[in-house]
Amino acid sequence: PRLVKPVPFLYPVIKHYERPYVGAGIALYDVLATIGSRKGRAMPFHRHLSKKALHRAFPALSDHAAPGAIKYWDASVDDARLTLTVVRTAAAYGALAASRTQLVELTKSGLGRVNGAVIKDLETGTEYTVKATNVINATGVWTEETESLAGTDGGLKVLASKGIHIVVPRERIRGDVGLILQTEKSVLFVIPWSRYWVIGTTDT
């Protein structure tokens, strides 16, 4: 929980008829967030804002940019720190963690079941064989490459995506919340991040 920070966003409604269906979609988002929370809601429900309230929240927007907006809450997390926290927690419960290692081979039992791995210490070049009851492939965009080391195809296709973002100092854009804006083919995010704004699409 200490790594997750709530982030408010505005979705400017360009046309008045957008309010009902966009609001309904975000309301569903609220419902799912409530159902998925074990200890009650962690963030407020969405709100409909007038043109004046929109301008107060994000003065950098033109007065004529939109007749209003919908404010909703999302969250941000430092994924590197989250991963490190998971590793440290596992180590505290008795797991052995090894950084700077490379998977060389997945070993199999006589029945053809994966039962361990050969890993290489990238600092010394030494290879070790590790036996395991279960082996979990959590290698992200390298999932298929890892599967190939076992000589099998798990049927899971993972496609890499790329995002290009512009990073702008916070003082260059007057606003207190994030923005999600419709473009011709996609959406554009303006996300507050530390002392900066991160501006860009999800994928390119």
What feature does the model see in each segment?
Residues 1-57:
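Dinucleotide-binding Rossmann-like beta1-alpha1 core, especially the glycine-rich loop
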Residues 3-8, 105, 129-133, 137-204:
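Active-site substrate-recognition segment that forms the wall
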Residues 10-15, 71-80, 96, 102-105, ...:
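Conserved short loop/turn motifs at secondary-structure junctions
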Residues 35-42, 55-93, 114-118, 130, ...:
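Helix-loop-beta segment of a Rossmann-like dinucleotide-binding subdomain
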Residues 48, 97, 129:
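Short aromatic/basic micro-patch
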Residues 51-59, 87, 188-197:
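Structured alpha-helical segments in the cores of large, soluble enzyme domains
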Residues 99-115:
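A conserved short coil-to-beta-strand element within the FAD-binding core of flavoproteins
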Residues 119-129, 133:
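A structured beta-alpha segment of the ubiquitous adenosine-cofactor-binding alpha/beta core
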